[in-house]
């Protein structure tokens, strides 16, 4: 069984791998843990770059807001919000996307959470209300009942 965070990662990786099949001007960044996930095709050797401001970062989440990344930075962000069963659910329901939003966010659209010196958790930054408003103003897909 997958941990819930791993399932979100799997959905995000699926979208990062699938979108370039239908949009030949972008490719999945081939650099291990490179940022962003999608970069302009042919711009970098072997379509691999550790960090660059060009491209789109992809996230998948079961939450309608409060999305997180690892660093507050200027980035195009695309979030695929989905609905699916959780491990405790007894009655199965089909996986579905409920909304897809994307926008260019600035460092000011993130709130850095950091961590204490004794913490082992991964550092995170959360999309602020200003970032959320940008994302919602530039919606790509909205399923019925999830506006």
Task: Show where each model-derived region lies.
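Nucleic-acid endonuclease domains
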Residues: 1-35, 39-55, 60-147
């Amino acid at each position: 069984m997958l941990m819930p965070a791993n399932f979100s990662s799997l959905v995000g990786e699926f979208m990062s791998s699938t979108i370039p099949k239908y949009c030949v001007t972008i490719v999945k960044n081939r650099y291990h843990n490179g940022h962003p996930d999608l970069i302009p095709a042919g711009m970098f050797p072997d379509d691999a770059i550790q960090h660059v401001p060009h491209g789109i970062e992809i996230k998948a989440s079961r939450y309608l807001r409060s999305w997180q990344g690892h660093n507050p930075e200027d980035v195009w962000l695309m979030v695929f919000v989905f609905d699916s069963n959780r491990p405790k659910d007894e009655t199965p329901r089909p996986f579905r996307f409920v909304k897809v939003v994307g926008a260019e966010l600035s460092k000011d659209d993130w709130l850095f959470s950091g961590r204490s010196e004794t913490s082992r958790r991964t550092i995170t930054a959360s999309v602020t209300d200003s970032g959320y408003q940008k994302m919602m103003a530039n919606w790509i897909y909205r399923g019925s009942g999830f506006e």
